[in-house]
């Protein structure tokens, strides 16, 4: 590296206090100086004079570094961190108090442990470097697949419990893997885009094998949102219009498989489960259809404050209760036990957190961080919408409300929110350029009477 240019870069970087930002900024300055030097060389200057002129045109390195230090600084997300912790603590207390004096299948200590683990995972996600995760996106996808695949045959032997971890992993963490993979494969043309879509297709097939259509819907929506985010910026180099059409067509074709998945689940329910669990099949018939009339009747008698009339509830073991009161229908239990106002307060707090993170995501300039945040918002939004529909008596899929319902879901959602806050904190990091596309070069070519033999196979595009 030329001495004058390297000295200039080092002097400028000495003024930047954020060590994580230095490599990217140094690369940008170095590239600009080299371009200026090459322009000077083309004008007939010697090497030393060209370097000196390039450095002179860039100005004072101390002033440049000071200006960069003013712009590129970490932005701690203390307020969002406290808000997310408070909402998770509220969700833990709701789960604990609503099931404390009831015949719940989930012990109260489990809710406390889930809340503590969620706080730990939030802190862990916040401490992680999202840009470092992007560099190992392929390995993360492989590890994700290794964890998910062994869970597929387990549900055959214990379908009521063992599917839950796989469902939550696909529902919440799939958008993260897709966002990181899309960022990692950017700039690689059709192989990169098709590779990311192949990953989405594989995860969609896994959703049907578990089976759970909510996770399948998450795969479709995440692929559409994140795919369009990258193709509209032509980060794969295939053309904005063509890439956008391909992603939209892929998501549409994927959505057509929803009826196929529904028929597949119906076949399992009617043919397989009765043979495996003849005594429990009545309990398995989906509560979405079996208990919906009870839920609607209970909601019709709900008050703004105070419990509902016990005669509107189901009596089990001499205790009036809401169907699935300690799991997916916890919000219905909240309405019937405390009233509409506490329900609106809980949902409003989550909506405030969601909109706050959405606003920060829109303002975020860094592509990788923005993609991760879009994936997280998609995961949270899908869970929230379908859970609200279920708890208000309009069921489509069984879903748990983020940070309020479900211990496993709370832990994974808190981890993802921590990653989003990490992306907000590092939003001032310099943007990394897409990888250069590899162009196929003929092994033997004849141009203008010159025979060329290529032994490397591929070269980097300029």
What do these predicted ranges mean?
Residues 1-46:
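N-terminal, intrinsically disordered, low-complexity segments
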Residues 45-102:
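Cytosolic juxtamembrane regions of integral membrane proteins
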Residues 108-133, 171-188, 222-237, 355:
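Transmembrane alpha-helical segments and their membrane-water interfaces
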Residues 113-121, 335-358:
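Hydrophobic alpha-helical transmembrane segments
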Residues 194-195, 199, 387-394, 398-462:
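A juxtamembrane structural motif centered on a specific transmembrane helix
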Residues 195-205, 214-260:
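Hydrophobic alpha-helical segments of polytopic membrane proteins
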Residues 240-343:
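Hydrophobic, glycine- and aromatic-enriched re-entrant/interface helices and adjoining loop segments
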Residues 360-398:
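Loop-to-helix entry and N-terminal half of a specific, functionally important transmembrane alpha helix
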């Amino acid at each position: 590296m030329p001495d004058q240019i390297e000295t200039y870069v080092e002097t400028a970087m000495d003024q930047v206090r954020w060590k994580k930002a230095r490599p990217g900024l140094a690369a940008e300055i170095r590239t600009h100086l080299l371009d200026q030097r090459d322009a000077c060389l083309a004008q007939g200057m010697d090497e030393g004079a060209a370097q000196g002129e390039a450095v002179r045109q860039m100005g004072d390195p101390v002033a440049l570094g000071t200006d960069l230090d003013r712009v590129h600084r970490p932005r701690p997300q203390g307020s969002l961190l406290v808000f997310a912790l408070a909402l998770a603590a509220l969700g833990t207390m709701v789960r604990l108090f609503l099931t404390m004096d009831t015949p719940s299948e989930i012990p109260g200590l489990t809710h406390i442990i889930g809340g503590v683990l969620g706080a730990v995972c939030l802190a862990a996600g916040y401490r992680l470097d999202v840009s470092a995760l992007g560099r190992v996106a392929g390995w993360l996808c492989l590890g994700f697949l290794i964890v998910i695949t062994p869970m597929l045959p387990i549900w055959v032997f214990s379908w009521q419990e063992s599917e839950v971890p796989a469902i939550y992993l696909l529902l919440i963490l799939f958008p993260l893997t897709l966002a990181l993979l899309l960022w990692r494969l950017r700039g690689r043309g059709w192989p990169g885009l098709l590779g990311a879509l192949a990953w989405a297709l594989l995860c969609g097939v896994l959703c049907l094998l578990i089976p759970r259509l909510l996770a399948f819907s998450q795969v479709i929506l995440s692929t559409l949102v994140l795919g369009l985010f990258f193709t509209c910026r032509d980060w794969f180099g295939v053309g904005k219009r063509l890439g956008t059409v391909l992603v939209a067509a892929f998501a549409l074709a994927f959505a057509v498989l929803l009826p196929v998945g529904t028929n597949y689940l119906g076949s399992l329910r009617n043919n397989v489960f009765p043979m495996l669990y003849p005594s429990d099949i009545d309990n398995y018939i989906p509560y979405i259809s079996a208990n919906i009339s009870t839920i609607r009747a209970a909601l019709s008698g709900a008050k703004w404050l105070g419990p509902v009339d016990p005669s509107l509830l189901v009596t089990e073991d001499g205790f009036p209760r809401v169907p699935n009161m300690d799991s997916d229908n916890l919000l219905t239990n909240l309405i019937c036990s405390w009233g509409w106002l506490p329900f609106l307060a809980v949902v409003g707090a989550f909506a405030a957190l969601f909109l706050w993170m959405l606003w920060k995501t829109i303002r975020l300039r860094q592509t990788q961080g923005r993609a991760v945040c879009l994936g997280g918002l998609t995961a949270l939004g899908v869970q929230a919408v379908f859970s609200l529909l279920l708890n208000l008596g309009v069921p489509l899929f069984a879903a748990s409300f983020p940070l309020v319902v479900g211990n496993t879901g709370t832990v994974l959602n808190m981890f993802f929110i921590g990653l989003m806050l990490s992306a907000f904190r590092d939003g001032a990091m310099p943007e990394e350029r897409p990888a250069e596309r590899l162009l196929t070069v003929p092994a033997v070519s004849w141009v203008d009477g010159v025979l060329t033999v290529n032994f490397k196979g591929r070269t980097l595009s300029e």
